[in-house]
């Protein structure tokens, strides 16, 4: 019973709670309904009111347009007030435009003050309300300006309306109410205008102007009219002038206005009067002083980021170019500001592409976000930047250097080498680079050598150092126009020699000692001095690279040859000291940049001297470097010795480098187990070669060998024409004969794998060698054979064209390499024709040339296009330098590219490229073909081995050496050496290194009857006993063994006659 009561009570309470909640929910729903109804009524009321107001505004504006309503200032004010209450930018666009036109029309009314909208500013009751209203109207004008595109016709009309509003009500100049008696009110009205401008600035007015200017000017052709640009610039300038050039407004003007791409360029083109306003207000002067104070420049740069900082830099440079007087007065601050801005940009310049970098057309890979909307304006920005290295600016900045007079010496005569070659030219926009009157500067002055005497802390030196820092910063920051900068800096023919003269005078003892001291000093002064050296090296290297031999050796543009000797000596010592003193081992940043700059200039001079000598004998050697010490350090793997060999091997005597090369090869042979030892013998590869098919059999059997097997011992067995094995054991001699024969055949121009240059004495891959089946595999095989000869120290008489040797060394990958430079080594006549085009003063298009090359290929005329569509592109004065380079590159690279790549691949499979980088092109030729010096008979006699009874005191041997020394010419001695060894040149390291050694053997019978030395033959030879008079026989040779077979002649005259005949006929083994 009690349990049922408890259940009913719980149910009752539950029902009561539910009832309360229902009542509460009903009340809330009623309240919500009432609130929603109120909101809807309010919304509908507001919509109705807005509609009524808009209708009223529309009726008013339509009436004013038709003339049915005469609008005065008060009616416009009231209607504007109503519109501004309900104003929405997107909905009231057309309405607002009509209102602005109405206001502007009122301002143009004649002699009716009550109509002028500005008259309300004079009403005590309405002044504050009017100011508030005009501020709002002008800001809405600004908001619309942000959205408009100047290149759209309709938008450009609206821009004119809104700009006119802003121009009209931010300056009292056009207010008719202030004319006459109202002039006394102008100060008060000016104050109101300043107040309006202040309000707009606080709201971000400069950002609006920046957007509109950028939209209209950041393109190849500006879309802003003269009037629009004038209005925009006037509006931008007003707050600055009104605030009496306060730091805050100067900063805003620089960040938002002067950072607009090529603004000054467009002003000078469209509205030159605005530039006069800049000048009259001294703006450039104020900009430079502001940016030079404390951290203002870095603050502005941080706000702008890289792309826009570059735009500001371009505009400042352009202003500096236009205002020469201010530039002279504020040169120190101008240079300092530009350096700081370039330094800021440089922090974000990257050397390579990565996930964090973006491509910039002037800065290259850039680690900040790049505004690609500015790309169209980059050509104009580049033109602005070019003023920095233009003649006008360089003359101003380097005035102290250029004012220096170089002492003249009329009696100096300069020996000029007779060989001819060319140097690279640079296809850059400076069209008249090669037509300058250079000749006057270099040919008559004293040689400039380090003399010292100028204090490095003097104002003059500090100024020049700062300028050099600026240009060096430009070179490392503006990476994509670096060549333009270098061309500009080298345009004045006397800048570089005078800068060198300036460097020579620095410090108490002259340049070298001072700069070496700077290397060990980490001070700001040292860095600036080294920047001067870097700039000099970069510019000089660029100049010498683009000059040809006539300009360097005969006209001696900028530098005399003796000065190049002095400079190269300075550079050689400087680089050597940097390496040997350990400064390069952990170098980075500025030190590494310094080294690459000085080393690059040094190597350009060295390579030019290798092609055509201007320096004295042994000029490049370091007398204080002992080769034995260097070799010891190389054995210990000391870093400085390795770097020396990598960067300046030329300081080591050539013979020592050849010894080093041979040591490297020997060590590799030992490492690969290719050398006979007491415990092991090297693996031997045996091949059988038919004499009638020597090339084919050699190719088939050797091309499949592994790299190590090719480097190892190869034994050759010859099979004669009858298919019978030839007698004899190959102890390197037969392989030498095989190798020499292979090389002789493949390099024979008749085979058409290689052909001779125009001079007929040098070889390079034949462009038509593709007629051979598997010709690329053949070239790779030939490369291996030549590599094997060099590897084994076998000299072969194969004279290569200089340009081909440069490619074998990898020089063509250098940024300083030019095909034109090497062209004479291929075809001197062709080179003369091309350089005559370069020097042609008339209109080159009259010659009817195109960017193509016509060639007779096996009876058919083939047209090779140098660029895509080249046969339809005429050669003009603008592209003729490019044409010369393209033509040279085609002849020496493109045309034989595949053959060269295959040959080099084969050669490098035997000879590593780093082994031969220590040699120049002529030195590599000597490594391949032996020394081109006179044959040293004493050395040959000392290292000759005698057989068959001959000995050093034998009568025939004495006659032989006497004939060679006194009766034979140099040419005949070379023929004699070729007769015995197959090569007319002696080994590089002397005859001690000839393998097999030079040998002379006494023979009694013909070669086909010769069975070698016997006891009887040796005794007869030793005691000069003859079976019969051998006067009818000729001397013969076995070149595979470097063996001269000499009959035991009875008279010296017979020996002379027979030997001369034999070597002239080059009979050798064949005449036996």
Swiss-Prot record:
Main location: other
Biochemical pathway: Protein modification; protein ubiquitination
InterPro entries for the chain: E3A/B/C-like (IPR044611), HECT_dom (IPR000569), Hect_E3_ubiquitin_ligase (IPR035983), IQ_motif_EF-hand-BS (IPR000048)
Catalytic reactions of this protein: S-ubiquitinyl-[E2 ubiquitin-conjugating enzyme]-L-cysteine + [acceptor protein]-L-lysine = [E2 ubiquitin-conjugating enzyme]-L-cysteine + N(6)-ubiquitinyl-[acceptor protein]-L-lysine
Residue ranges of every copy of the HECT domain listed in the record: 706-1072
Stated name of the protein: Ubiquitin-protein ligase E3B
Domain called IQ: residue spans: 29-58
Subcellular location: Postsynaptic density
Bridged cysteine pairs (disulfide): none
Superkingdom, natural source: Eukaryota
EC number: 2.3.2.26
A GO CC annotation given for this chain: postsynaptic density
This protein's UniProt keywords: Synapse, Transferase, Ubl conjugation pathway
Active site, per annotation: 1040 (glycyl thioester intermediate)
Free-text function comment from the UniProt entry: E3 ubiquitin-protein ligase which accepts ubiquitin from an E2 ubiquitin-conjugating enzyme in the form of a thioester and then directly transfers the ubiquitin to targeted substrates.
Cross-referenced Pfam families: HECT, IQ
